Amino acid sequence: MTITRKKHPLFKIINHSFINLPTPSNISSWWNFGSLLGLCLMVQILTGLFLAMHYTSDTTTAFSSVAHICRDVNYGWLIRYMHANGASMFFICLFLHVGRGIYYGSYNMIETWNVGIVLLLTVMATAFMGYVLPWGQMSFWGATVITNLLSAIPYIGSTLVEWIWGGFSVDKPTLTRFFAFHFILPFIITALVLVHLLFLHETGSTNPTGLNSDADKIPFHPYYTIKDLLGALLLLSALMILVLFFPDALGDPDNYTPANPLNTPAHIKPEWYFLFAYAILRSIPNKLGGVLALLLSILILALMPILHTSKQRTLVFRPITQTVYWILVADLLILTWIGGQPVEYPFAIIGQAASIAYFSIIVILMPIAGIIENDIMDLN
């Protein structure tokens, strides 16, 4: 008699995805971040669900309802800070996951990569709308500044902004619809994750060498389930240290002041995980140009498969491109720092230089490095 998990219509999907999945025997801990992102998503959906039970999406009571959650609801403070800091952990895992994909040439699995880009954009949209919900100063002004960017779209821009606002400024209708979208998007993300996995399992995972590993595959369970479990334990430990010891380390003090449309904060800035894109946006003096650069900072990832010039898949045996890659990582850290600084000398000029470097590295330097390495290999 065959085991139920191999025959049952529902269980066999799980069996082929998480138990008997043939997996390369040499994948490193960099391949853990997919499962960690799944864990982050589950934590966010669960904590978000419990927060939604006590939150009110009305401008007069939103701020008070968040204070009520922290003060009066049993373990409300824990749920709230797990949700807020869980978003930070989510983005840390996302950036490392994308960074791994670039380093090991995973972008050559085009469908998986493109669904991943859509996922990244959707998670960013969800996080942005979530930041608006507590209705603090930075929530309100962040929403005003970012939604206002759509007014840069020629002809329909102003109408579009008012349509999104539901009025002539960010107000009650904006908050209500942002809450509705923030609630539904994680479920859309979950569906996209399944599509992402569907495409991944069509080709199978890559491995650090970039070579075909069909001859050396092992079952996912128990080898990688136990490895993912260790990763999950480390992630949850890091999250709980953040939540229990430094809950406000990554937040903005301005968000503990209720939203006031008559008082603009000195420095309007988004959460830390958007600072690199915000720096690119601010580094271009033209409004429409800034919006396009902001979009391109993420969408440029879709060009990675086209810009791949090397005969090798990964960067493991390519020291020149490795150097360029780590310069790109340093550049992104500089952009993140600049995004949190005021627009004045010397920050403005550093931001412009770092923005030019960001696009130049991806579009020009990495493809050239690949060609040079091909030529060096041909000489041998």
From Swiss-Prot:
Keywords: Electron transport, Heme, Iron, Membrane, Metal-binding, Mitochondrion, Mitochondrion inner membrane, Respiratory chain, Transmembrane, Transmembrane helix, Transport, Ubiquinone
InterPro entries: Cyt_b/b6_C, Cyt_b/b6_C_sf, Cyt_b/b6_N, Cytb/b6-like_sf, Cytochrome_b, Cytochrome_b_C_euk/bac, Cytochrome_b_N_euk/bac, Di-haem_cyt_TM
Cofactor note: Binds 2 heme b groups non-covalently.
GO MF entries: metal ion binding; ubiquinol-cytochrome-c reductase activity
Cofactor(s) the record lists: heme b
Positions that bind heme b b566: H97, H196
Gene3D superfamilies: Cytochrome Bc1 Complex, Chain C
Transmembrane segments: 33-53, 77-98, 113-133, 178-198, 226-246, 288-308, 320-340, 347-367
Subcellular location(s) of the protein: Mitochondrion inner membrane
Superkingdom of this protein's organism: Eukaryota
Membrane-topology annotation of the record: Multi-pass membrane protein
Binding locations of a ubiquinone: H201
Binding-site residues, heme b b562: H83, H182
Main location: mitochondrion
PROSITE patterns: CYTB_CTER, CYTB_NTER
Biological process annotations from GO: mitochondrial electron transport, ubiquinol to cytochrome c
Other remarks in the entry: Heme 1 (or BL or b562) is low-potential and absorbs at about 562 nm, and heme 2 (or BH or b566) is high-potential and absorbs at about 566 nm.
Quaternary structure (record): The cytochrome bc1 complex contains 11 subunits: 3 respiratory subunits (MT-CYB, CYC1 and UQCRFS1), 2 core proteins (UQCRC1 and UQCRC2) and 6 low-molecular weight proteins (UQCRH/QCR6, UQCRB/QCR7, UQCRQ/QCR8, UQCR10/QCR9, UQCR11/QCR10 and a cleavage product of UQCRFS1). This cytochrome bc1 complex then forms a dimer.
Function: Component of the ubiquinol-cytochrome c reductase complex (complex III or cytochrome b-c1 complex) that is part of the mitochondrial respiratory chain. The b-c1 complex mediates electron transfer from ubiquinol to cytochrome c. Contributes to the generation of a proton gradient across the mitochondrial membrane that is then used for ATP synthesis.
Family designation: Belongs to the cytochrome b family.
Name used for this protein in its record: Cytochrome b
Species for this entry: Myopus schisticolor (Wood lemming)
